[in-house]
């Protein structure tokens, strides 16, 4: 939008607590049960505590993002002064999750100036299962780090919509294929040298990291890696072994989808009635997800599915409701009513027998 600055990361005004985040994850999982919900955290002191809360909020994947951030939309102050090495944030996150018995139910991804197979091996030993590459991949495609991504003036045509500048782009998909092929080959060679068959076998194995011998520089001997390489000795998993239980198998939408099958499949007009309680969260999200997957953003014809509710609806009532779906609630609704409304209609009315007038 002209005149509106692009700042990364943007503020999220619907998330002020772990409970808010848990509700967002629940909403998104309802819309697309097959999606892996990822939460990105900046590597910093104390990130382990936040990561534990994110794991309890049922995120499927936690990203620990280190270094200064590669996006050209970052404020200069953030690029210069924010962010620490990903090793520090990853190590703290791994130790905290294992200590609290949460590590087995989440995937850990790390990014931040990863460039070589050695970087991948070290990050895996510190606890990561997935690895993000951004800056190095952009450079492979021709990026010259002008940091003009948000100004539409990229001189090599990597990040711009300007047709003349885009003509300067010389990147090819083969370059990326070669880069990651060589990267994987280097990882394979390191694994063979260590004596393991799979990358999974070294995840969380900080005991395999050996400090370099004395190089004669006295200052190096003052650095202690004990905290960074500490390994929590308990019976908890040290890598992802099981999926999160999101509790979406018994939401109100499962019942609605069964009753509204004719409307969803054949666009037949149907009216339904239900009682609803404040434990029924994200009502309509899964229904909308199924309709959107089948018909796209156009949804259903107008007034195809009309659902009337009575009671006190839980959070995110009518979230992401698509065209052709009408919700009428006689009662009250909680936070995030009509969140992300996508063309559907929601009417909330006081109960018929209420005694108040305002």
Regions found by a protein language model. Give the residues of each.
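Gly-rich Lys/Arg/Thr-decorated short loops/hinges at beta-loop-alpha junctions or inter-strand turns
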Residues: 1-12, 29-34, 68-81, 103, ...
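Flexible glycine/proline-rich, aromatic-decorated loop/lid segments
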Residues: 59-70, 80-93, 125-165
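Catalytic cores of alpha/beta
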Residues: 46-56, 115-127
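Feature marks extracellular polysaccharide-active and adherence modules
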Residues: 290, 310, 320, 328-332, ...
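Active-site or pore-adjacent capping/gating segments
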Residues: 131, 139-206, 210
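Conserved small/polar residues in nucleotide/adenosyl-binding loops
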Residues: 357-358
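Terminal amphipathic helices with adjacent charged low-complexity linkers/tails
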Residues: 61, 65-70, 196-249, 330-333, ...
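The right-handed parallel beta-helix/beta-solenoid scaffold, focusing on the short coil/turn
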Residues: 303-305, 317, 323-325, 337, ...
């Amino acid at each position: 939008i002209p005149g509106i600055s692009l700042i990364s990361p943007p503020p999220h005004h619907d998330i002020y607590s772990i409970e808010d985040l848990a509700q967002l994850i629940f909403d998104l999982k309802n819309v697309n049960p097959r999606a892996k919900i990822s939460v990105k955290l900046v590597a910093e002191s104390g990130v382990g505590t936040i990561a534990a809360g994110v794991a309890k909020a049922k995120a499927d994947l936690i990203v620990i993002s280190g270094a200064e951030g590669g996006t050209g939309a970052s404020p200069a102050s953030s690029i210069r002064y924010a962010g620490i090495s990903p090793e520090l944030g990853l190590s703290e996150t791994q130790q905290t999750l294992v200590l609290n018995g949460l590590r087995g139910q989440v995937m850990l991804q790390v990014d931040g100036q990863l460039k070589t197979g050695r970087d991948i091996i070290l990050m895996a030993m510190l606890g990561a299962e997935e690895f993000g590459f951004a800056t190095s991949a952009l450079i492979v495609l021709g990026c010259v780090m002008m940091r003009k991504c948000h100004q539409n003036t990229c001189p090599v045509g990597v990040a711009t919509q300007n047709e003349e500048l885009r003509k300067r782009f010389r990147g090819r998909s083969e370059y990326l294929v070669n880069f990651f092929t060589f990267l994987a080959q280097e990882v394979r060679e390191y694994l063979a040298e260590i004596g393991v068959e799979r990358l999974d076998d070294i995840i969380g194995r900080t005991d395999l990291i050996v400090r370099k011998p004395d190089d004669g520089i006295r200052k190096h001997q003052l650095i202690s890696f004990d905290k960074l390489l500490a390994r929590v000795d308990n019976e908890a998993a040290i890598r992802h072994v099981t999926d999160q239980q999101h509790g979406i198998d018994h939401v109100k939408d499962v019942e609605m989808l069964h009753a509204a099958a004719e409307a969803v499949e054949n666009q037949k007009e149907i009216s339904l009635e239900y009682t609803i309680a404040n434990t029924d969260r994200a009502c309509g999200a899964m229904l909308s997800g199924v309709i959107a997957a089948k018909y796209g953003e156009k949804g259903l014809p107008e007034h195809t599915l009309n659902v009337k509710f009575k009671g006190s609806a839980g959070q995110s009532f009518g979230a992401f409701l698509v065209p052709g779906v009408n919700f009428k609630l006689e009662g009250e609704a909680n936070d995030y009513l009509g969140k992300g409304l996508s063309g559907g209609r929601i009417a909330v009315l006081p109960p018929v027998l209420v005694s108040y007038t305002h």
